[in-house]
Amino acid sequence: MAGKPFDRRGAARNLQTADARVGVRSYRNAPTKGVAVAETRFVYRELGLPTGVPVIFVNHLTGNLDNWDPRVVDGIAARHRVITFDNRGVGATGGTTPDSVEAMARDTVAFIRALRFDQVDLLGFSLGGFVSQLIAQQVPTLVRKIILAGTGPAGGEGIVNVTKRTYLDMLQALVTLKDPKELLFFTRTANGKSEARAFVKRLKERTADRDRAITPRAFRRQLKAIHAWGLEAPSDLAGIQQPVLVANGDDDRMVPTSNSYDLARRLPNATLRIYPDAGHGGIFQFHERFVREALEFLGS
């Protein structure tokens, strides 16, 4: 007796239903969504588990949705609900980019509230780490755990020099036909250069529905916010009682690694991870190790 012909449409529907239960599996294919925050549309991508405390990725200077390493996003999404987003005025999100970290933190909280989350974990990289610290200080009940990568405290060593360093490396990248992140995020050793090229290649894996690049005006306003953060008086980090994982490379040229040691010393419940022969983007260079450590931290 002949079997029934293969139902391709039915199989596709079943696969879509299964994907809905487990969540989108790959950042490469995660759809870009939008949510109204007051009168501004914020764009975001969501993947991983459909339930549980979400991990909100808070981005770096010039960073949009496409600037997160897919190995890090997919690795954490294997066990958690992950959400990346463009803050106000960045990428495809509307509005004007704030020129202060405090305003960026308020916008991030408003975005989280718009998605109706009562509690989240934060992964803040670089500028996103500044923002994450303020959120934990100002709305402590919203935050369960925090990962601070390639970042530093208010008034931290060398943060006021980020603007100069960024422009110099962008100019060098233009002359040498490189992505600026190859210079800003990685060491100039043979290994660092190799890892930088691999990272930039991974950022190009997504070919459809890519985000908009940051505008020059938004870039300048972000730099203004970073410079002001570097000029601030040190804040009392003892009030951040949540568990914190601090991670960085041992040779961060943007936010000097000394700031990571300072954070780990001043935060009451901090764990420090420093990666060898790595720079500002140490969590991307050592993505396999970082994902293991992040999953252990978030799951403990």
Question: Where are the regions a protein language model picked out?
Answer:
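Conserved HGGG/HGGXW glycine-rich cap/lid loop of the alpha/beta-hydrolase fold
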Residues: 40-94
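Active-site loop/oxyanion-hole signature of alpha/beta-hydrolase fold enzymes
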Residues: 83-123, 292
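Gly/Ala-rich beta-loop-alpha elbow adjacent to hydrolase catalytic centers
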Residues: 124-128, 132
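Flexible "cap/lid" loop of the alpha/beta hydrolase fold
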Residues: 137, 144-176
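Conserved alpha/beta-hydrolase catalytic His-Asp/Glu region
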Residues: 179-231, 235-236
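Short beta-strand/loop motif that positions the catalytic acidic residue
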Residues: 240, 246-248
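Acidic catalytic loop of the alpha/beta-hydrolase fold
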Residues: 251-255
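Catalytic histidine-centered segment of alpha/beta-hydrolase-like enzymes
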Residues: 272, 278-291
